[in-house]
Amino acid sequence: MAEESVSTQFLSNIIGKPVHVKLYSGMLYSGVLESIDGFMNVALSETREHYEHPNNNLLKKYASDVFLRGTQVMYISEA
């Protein structure tokens, strides 16, 4: 049986929890992680959009799910 990598284990453990997703563009999305795949494509619910930092002014709040393309994701952290 192959061991899960630390990053795979981390991502599995935070599904359904609040996260911050930073994009290379500088945008920061905060929401509940609904799903993530091997390409780092991310689906969030209850999402808020900020620029650079969550304490900056809220740019937009989304009522529906938000999908972020994995090639644009710099990092994902637990909120």
From Swiss-Prot:
Gene Ontology BP terms: maturation of SSU-rRNA; mRNA splicing, via spliceosome; tRNA processing
Question: Gene Ontology cellular component?
Answer: nucleolus; P-body; sno(s)RNA-containing ribonucleoprotein complex; spliceosomal complex; U4/U6 x U5 tri-snRNP complex; U6 snRNP
Q: Name one GO molecular function term.
A: RNA binding
Q: How does it assemble?
A: Component of the heptameric LSM1-LSM7 complex, which consists of LSM1, LSM2, LSM3, LSM4, LSM5, LSM6 and LSM7. Component of the heptameric LSM2-LSM8 complex, which consists of LSM2, LSM3, LSM4, LSM5, LSM6, LSM7 and LSM8. The LSm subunits form a seven-membered ring structure with a doughnut shape.
Task: Give its localization.
Answer: Cytoplasm; Nucleus
InterPro entries to which the protein is assigned, alphabetical: Lsm6/sSmF, LSM_dom_sf, Sm, Sm_dom_euk/arc
Quick check: keyword Signal in the entry?
A: no
The protein, known as = U6 snRNA-associated Sm-like protein LSm6
* Gene it is expressed from: LSM6
| Principal location listed in the UniProt entry | cytoplasm
Q: Which residues form the Sm domain?
A: 6-79
Q: Which Gene3D superfamilies match?
A: 2.30.30.100
Q: Which SUPFAM superfamilies match?
A: Sm-like ribonucleoproteins
Does the keyword Ribonucleoprotein belong to this entry?
A: yes
Q: List, alphabetically, the SMART domains matched.
A: Sm
Recorded family membership: Belongs to the snRNP Sm proteins family. SmF/LSm6 subfamily.
Q: Which UniProt keywords apply?
A: Cytoplasm, mRNA processing, mRNA splicing, Nucleus, Ribonucleoprotein, RNA-binding, rRNA processing, Spliceosome, tRNA processing
- Please explain the role this protein plays, according to its UniProt record: Component of LSm protein complexes, which are involved in RNA processing and may function in a chaperone-like manner, facilitating the efficient association of RNA processing factors with their substrates. Component of the cytoplasmic LSM1-LSM7 complex, which is thought to be involved in mRNA degradation by activating the decapping step in the 5'-to-3' mRNA decay pathway. Component of the nuclear LSM2-LSM8 complex, which is involved in splicing of nuclear mRNAs.
